[in-house]
Regions:
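A short beta-alpha structural unit
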Residues: 65-67, 111-123, 151-161
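Mobile "lid/hinge" segments at catalytic clefts and subdomain interfaces of large enzymes
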Residues: 14-74
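Internal helix-turn-beta structural module
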Residues: 128-132, 136-172
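Short acidic, glycine/serine/threonine-rich loops at helix termini
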Residues: 17-22, 77-79, 127-129, 156
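Short, small-residue-biased leader/transition segments that mark boundaries at the very start
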Residues: 2-6
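A glycine- and small/hydrophobic-rich beta-loop-beta segment
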Residues: 70-146
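Signal for well-folded cores of large energy- and translation-related assemblies
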Residues: 14, 28, 43-46, 50, ...
Length: 172
């Protein structure tokens, strides 16, 4: 099985939008895993963690996320899909989602961490489109920072997200 030993370090809390921005993240594990499988795991994990955070709406050209595996765990090397890969992927995703939330909560001027979960969308892409519209919305940010639960602003952001939405089924 994949090692339970992970080390992590991430930094960056400005110019984090939409895809990592000027953040740095270095991850290490003792797991034995092939370069192809670790690359696949990292790309899929970054897509659903670091590439989904927004702090200030500005994008930087500089970002890095690296994962290194030294193989010292002594596990049978992960060279393809299967239970061991799924375990490794789940652990890597957990670590990256945690780091992404920490970066967003430490954002320049951030007083709150807002997460948006979309359920019932026709596709993951539409759900992501709606969620990003909500968390990027300056009006939603003002409402959250001012502790004014103005749900109309959330609905407005969902409406202009560009996804197919049946407004009669929306519940905020």
């Amino acid at each position: 099985a994949a090692s339970d030993v992970y080390k992590r370090q991430a930094k960056g809390s400005g110019m984090i939008h939409p895809n990592m921005g000027t953040m740095l993240c270095f991850l290490t594990t003792d797991c034995a895993i092939s370069p192809e499988m670790i690359k696949s795991a990292l790309l899929d994990t970054v897509r659903v963690s670091f590439n989904r955070i927004s702090v200030d709406g500005d994008t930087s050209t500089n970002d890095t996320c690296v994962v290194l595996a030294n193989g010292l765990a002594g596990n049978t090397p992960i060279t393809g899909p299967g239970a061991d890969y799924d375990t490794f992927f789940a652990a890597l995703r957990h670590v990256c989602e945690y780091e992404a939330k920490m970066i967003a909560s430490d954002g320049e001027g951030a007083g709150r961490l807002v997460t948006c979960t979309v359920q019932g969308a026709e596709t993951e892409e539409q759900a992501e489109q709606m969620a990003k519209a909500v968390v990027r919305s300056p009006l939603v940010k003002c409402a959250m920072f001012g502790t004014d639960a103005n749900w109309g602003r959330v609905l407005c952001a969902i409406g202009y997200a560009g996804a197919d939405v049946d407004v009669s089924k929306v519940d905020v």
